Amino acid sequence: MNNLIIPKDYQSALNLHDTQVGIKTVKDFFQNLLAERLHLLRVSAPLFVDPASGLNDNLNGVERPVVFGIKEQNEAQAEIVHSLAKWKRYALQKYGFSYGEGLYTDMSAIRRDELTDNIHSIYVDQWDWEKIISREERSIDFLQETVRSVYKVLRKTEKYMAIRYDYIEEILPHDIFFITTQELEDMYPGTTPKEREYLIAKEKGAVCLMQIGDLLKSGEKHDGRAPDYDDWALNADIIVYYPVLDISLELSSMGIRVDKDAMISQLDKAGCPERAELPFQKAIINDELPLTIGGGIGQSRICMFFLRKAHIGEVQSSLWPEDVTKAALENGIQLL
């Protein structure tokens, strides 16, 4: 229970029934506007994949996927997805998408090794999106342009919710602030990555933190990223300050995806060059998959933020430690 933050005198403005209405309101408005602005088509997506395909997201490389055997297929193994970061790029080609077009999915995942707290759950739900780009668009300028488009959707959603609900006030700034992980480390020496994120988010309100995954001058990484989907020089997190919990809150992780050269380099840096032999990774090396940009946007985090909830368990149904459930209820936090 050490990870549970209990805001002083917290009381949800919405009961359980009205919370469900609010969740649907946020999700419907946000995803429809996102699809319109980024030219995305909703597609069906897998809950599990073949481990041998290389399509699962390895996250930081140490998290264990949920694995089960399929009786009809002689107990052939299947993995519950961590995310659809790689599958989406494969799907764009398989489904016949063209330049400038993209897809999005309602992704559900289980992350069994997640350390839970107010904003982390073993159940992950997000809008996973991916879009075909040109080689010329593999640039910081295009990344920032796309981030601004996503951020405008966030701001419009907040404005819409503030009109629908009297208790919601707009807190997102007009513009998002761009900074690299190295610039952030230089700005706040002697701090941890999470401390730096909090400091810059509280100062700016909304931050796009770029270039995540490679080593900084300090010899440390700001955060881990799998080497075979994001280009570590062309990725970003959208982070906002969340006053309900007095924390920095990541709402989206996104990036321009690796091309052949970036993936080979990053696999080598990550110490797993053998992954280049997996089907998905080999397809990138052979230039068989389109160049893309994509990301994941946390559905529960979006709902939590716009409904001003104190715990992600107020907007999604998951399993929590018994002492957390008890302490939350005693302090006005009703977990679903």
Where are these regions (language model features)?
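A generic secondary-structure signal for well-formed alpha-helical elements
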Residues: 34-41, 150-161, 310
